[in-house]
Amino acid sequence: MNLPWALLLVLLSHRQLLPWLRTVGETSLNDFYSEAQAKLFLQFYEQTAQVVLNEFMEATWNYVTNITKQNQKNMLQKEADRSQFMLYFSTRARMFRTDHFLNQDVKRMLRKLQNIDKSALPTEDLLEYNRLLTYMETAYNRAEVCLDEGPCLTLEPDLQEIMATSRDQKELLWAWQGWRDAVGRQLRPVFEDYVRLSNKAAQYNGYKDMGALWRSKYESDTLEEDLEQLYKELQPLYLNLHAYVRRSLYRYYGPELIDLRGPIPAHLLGNMWAQSWNNILDLVLPYPTKAPEDITAIMKIQHWRPEKMFEEANLFFTSMGMLPAPPAFWIKSMMEKPADGREVECHTSSWNFYKFNDFRVKKCTEVTLEDLLSVFHQMGHIQYFLQYQNLSVIYQEGASPAFEEAVGSVIALSVSSHKYLLARGLLSQPHQDSEEEVNFLLGIALEKIAFIPFSYLVDKFRWKIFDGTISKITYNQEWWNFRLKYQGLCPPVPRSDDDFDPGAKFHIPANVPYIRYFLGLILQFQLHEALCEASGHVGPLHQCDNYNSKVAGKILGDLLKLGSSRPWREVLQEVTGESNISTKAFLTYFKPLMDWLVTENVKQGDTLGWPDFSCSFEEKITSKVSFLGTDTEPEQAYLGQWVLLSMSFFMLVLILALGFRLHYLEKQLLDEDTMILKTLPYSYFLGIAMEPHQAARKQWLLLGLCCILMLCCIGLLIRIVTQNTENTPWMKNEGQS
């Protein structure tokens, strides 16, 4: 049934539409838009939203776990229905004058209901936007990098495995460049339209641009300033880690690839996006003779399977007195990549289906320590869903997006501890000495500290695109300017604005805000410290393990039960005693490592940062091309080239016709009677009377000149075409560095 009619039926069946119909012709709407009516309005929204949202989530799940045209069509239809539904209720929520409402909960729910993101777009724009988003995400999910003579490789697990385990810089370069060429260049032509429609949606919601709408989720007027301050407080940690890792890579790869005062090539850090460096721990280990045990290898020896990894995470939460994953979770989740040949979206995510106890995870799990920690993170999302499922649909989200990301990572900090891994049989050495402790902390730092600048810059970059600071012709150049400024990284081969390297990161084509990960990274340590103090932990923060701590579980569960029903600052205040996100716990956790890094870098004489360095970039300040000595737009140049070609063809046909006509006339003149020639002694050439044989000679000369001009025209055209399509140097030589 079409949604508007279904909605009308439901409205009538609940007797909620009649008050709205009766208002027509009334002298005053004050009674109708009263606080009491607002409560009835919200009750009805609750009853209908669960059905509409569940249908949309089911259709989307069906598509991402089985990418077909029919499933895509169904998903887009349900998305259109959901958007129409949200627009209906958002429009009516704006009609309530909440200034004099006494119930703060009603005011908060109405305010949240008014912000409906892309659903505010007009129908045609919304359909175009949804098609665009689907195209970008599908292009990302289906992208492959093909060997010259061999199979084509997908991102997960193939290319990620190469980036994590290979130490051959040429192979790493092949995977790194191949992925960006396969994805980014598909997305580059459509990204401008995505930005335009995103901003249009934001403006319909009352915001200047989409960046402003995204920032509004944090209910803070000083968010950007607060973020900059947090980043500055953590920057010394990153700079010291960067300098240490750079020197370690210099020892392995040599001066041909690494400059001890410069940025690091982005393909050498063990991760497709260089956001986490833990896969190169073996290259940078401070004390190689005391290398940590290979937990991934131990898991495989013990025959761990993806489902066991999820069971282990579930056990951790229940040990703290929290809720177990429901039976439907184990049946409906996609815990590993299907073996039946289906195309799926492998990017890890957790799903709330707005139906009692229907929560799922989608993950192409591999048996590795990295994926084990990721599983714990996802089960943190599931725990959040379980805890707040009794709240209104409007409140079924984290206190802020950062809280959603922090919850699972809080548990992962305990899981990473030596104490927990030993208890679960994943380590055999009962104690750590000081050198082993430094090795351990560096392993954590390669994941957490290395992530600081990347998690900060992704949205900072997008916000500047949305507000127009970064123009479409410099997307890629500005991306690498950000990567250099904040991460100290450069592309291993020159890139141009024909490329679109931001699109090689899932969250860009999938339209997922990213600043949540930066704030969540800091918040997880702040929450971890509070839970450890509550559970009575004594000793360094990195040794704390909250497994079996019912006290910590009670505090965390109470936080999760609130959903987004209260401002995040109030929630944080109750748990930590602070109303602001603070870096103090983060710095405390890594203080032993920071002291060691500073000492080591001073001893080696290492430079912090990358002063006076820039990345090699094939600059294209303008998209104009040269045509006949003038700069013009590519489309105009191509049109001009086709006009020249058409003119050349026309001239060729004309010259051939004239030649045949001339030959015929000349033959006719030679065959005519001599007496006739005497009566017509002259022919004309360009209006001048002359002997027939002289006129014929000049006509042949003119024909030859026209042929020469035609050949020159064709030669010029060929030169223009070859000039514009010439390959860039780094595309010719894959091994160039």
From Swiss-Prot:
Detail the disulphide connectivity of this chain as listed in its UniProt entry.
C146-C152, C346-C364, C532-C544
* Biological-process GO terms, alphabetical: proteolysis
List the GO cellular component terms: acrosomal membrane; acrosomal vesicle
Q: Which residues lie on this side of the membrane: Extracellular?
A: 24-639, 722-737
InterPro entries the record matches: Peptidase_M2 (IPR001548)
Report the subcellular localization.
Cytoplasmic vesicle, Secretory vesicle, Acrosome membrane
**Positions of chloride 1 binding:** R180, W479, R483
Q: Where are the transmembrane segments?
A: 640-660, 701-721
Residue ranges of the Peptidase M2 domain?
32-611
* Family to which this protein belongs: Belongs to the peptidase M2 family.
| Description of how the protein assembles with itself and partners | Interacts with IZUMO1.
Q: State the name under which the record lists this protein.
A: Angiotensin-converting enzyme-like protein Ace3
Species of origin reads Mus musculus
Task: Name the encoding gene, please.
Answer: Ace3
